[in-house]
């Protein structure tokens, strides 16, 4: 085993460890800020850790007729997000840098949502089925935006390799293209939907559907789904910073300064998500789809501009 492989393994362990440890922390801070905005005391910041430990400590109840997808969907959902975390820089170079292309990243981040869909479908509850239908409509409208954003970056980098796209974004001194500016606006406006926060959490909608696809889940499997959702917020935030606002978070003269700047920007983005979620009402599914349709039109314009070098 050569040194490159050893460092890749160490980097993967560090990235996964950072996501697993920091995701509940960010969730706890998110809850606390939301409570303060709404003039409530709110739970302690450590509450997400306690909730996960409580769920993981419960008995995993299954019947003999439990479908295989219902048994393994939670594990696959969390695994897909953690694998994506190894492709995305977390303040330092991604441990699997160069091991995958943008198509793999799109696949991994979409797979988490697909696992939730299949898990809800296997449960068969009425509320689950309504949540699934909403989630499916949202994914059909939303995933093209993410794909176009990645492809626009790939066009400017002249490569579909993820490291080329992100490295080109971090170290490029060229002017910010019009297509990049448009996609920055599109992704920023739709970011709440990517991380399934208000006003676009129509598929779960606790007050309407009692968490929709996850209604029939409890114990360790529910903990894994919750963990995947928390981790997704962190991975998407890190990817957004690496692609669209990388300035200052690359290699620095002082070790660790770039890492601190990177996580400061991630924290600002999570704070923005929190403020929007705490101050907006949930959209109806038809309102959300119309909103995404408008963003898709702008994204297609950005794709055309990128094709012509703008």
PLM region spans:
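Alpha-helical transmembrane segments of multi-pass membrane proteins predominantly involved
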Residues: 1-310
């Amino acid at each position: 085993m050569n040194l490159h492989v050893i460092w890749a393994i160490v980097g993967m362990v560090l990235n996964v460890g950072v996501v697993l440890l920091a995701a509940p922390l960010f969730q706890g801070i998110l809850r606390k800020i939301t409570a303060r905005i709404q003039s409530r005391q709110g739970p302690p910041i450590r509450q997400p850790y306690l909730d996960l430990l409580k769920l993981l400590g419960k008995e995993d109840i299954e019947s003999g007729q439990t479908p295989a997808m219902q048994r393994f969907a939670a594990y696959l959902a969390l695994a897909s997000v953690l694998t994506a975390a190894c492709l995305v820089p977390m303040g330092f170079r991604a441990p699997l840098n160069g091991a995958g292309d943008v198509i793999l990243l799109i696949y991994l981040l979409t797979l988490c949502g697909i696992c939730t869909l299949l898990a809800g479908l296997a449960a068969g509850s009425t509320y689950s089925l309504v949540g699934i239908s909403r989630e499916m409509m949202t994914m059909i409208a939303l995933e093209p935006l993410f794909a176009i954003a990645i492809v626009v970056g790939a066009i400017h980098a002249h490569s579909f390799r993820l490291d080329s796209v992100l490295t080109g974004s971090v170290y490029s001194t060229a002017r910010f293209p019009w297509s990049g500016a448009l996609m920055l606006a599109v992704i920023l406006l739709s970011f709440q939907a990517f991380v399934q926060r208000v006003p676009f959490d129509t598929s779960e909608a606790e007050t309407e559907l009692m968490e929709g696809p996850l209604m029939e889940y409890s114990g360790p499997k529910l903990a894994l789904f919750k963990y995947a959702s928390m981790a997704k917020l962190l991975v998407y935030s890190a990817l957004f910073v690496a692609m669209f606002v990388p300035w200052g978070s690359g290699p620095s003269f002082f070790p660790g300064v770039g890492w601190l700047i990177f996580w400061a920007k991630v924290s600002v983005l999570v704070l923005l998500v929190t403020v929007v979620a705490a101050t907006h009402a949930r959209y109806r599914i038809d309102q959300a789809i119309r909103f995404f349709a408008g963003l898709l039109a702008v994204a297609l314009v950005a794709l055309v501009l990128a094709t012509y070098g703008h």
